[in-house]
Design a protein with these regions (language model features):
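Pepsin/retropepsin-fold aspartyl endopeptidases
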Residues: 1-109
Length: 109
């Protein structure tokens, strides 16, 4: 049986030698990062522009590929850049990254 790292609903993520507290969201397919944080970290280049559906309607967002470390697991993921300044967490980790890292989510952590 493969050992799976347990993660909670929020986790510390390292991106470009910067610690960010990210929200783990199994309802989101992809990962997202705040546009101001992306600018501060100088993320890029933009690899795609995709259309996303949200409660506010449809938006087009830039997508970058970046390496992150989550629970000692290093992985390259796609991050869409969005305005998250009104959100509690500046980064969101979606299902694609969770599958890639083979994580087990423990909501009590």
């Amino acid at each position: 049986m493969v050992k799976r790292d347990k993660i909670g609903l929020t986790e510390e993520v390292h991106i470009r030698n910067t610690k960010v507290i990210a929200r783990i969201d199994t309802g989101a397919r992809r990962c997202s990062i705040d546009k101001q944080l992306a600018k501060t970290l100088n993320l890029g280049p933009v690899v795609d522009i995709r259309r996303y559906r949200s409660a506010a309607g449809h938006t087009r967002r830039e997508v970058v590929e970046e390496e992150i470390i989550l629970k000692k697991t290093k992985m390259r993921i796609l991050l869409n850049i969005s305005d998250r300044r009104r959100m509690k967490y500046r980064m969101l980790i979606g299902r694609e990254a969770l599958r890639k890292g083979n994580f087990l989510i423990d909501p009590l952590r």
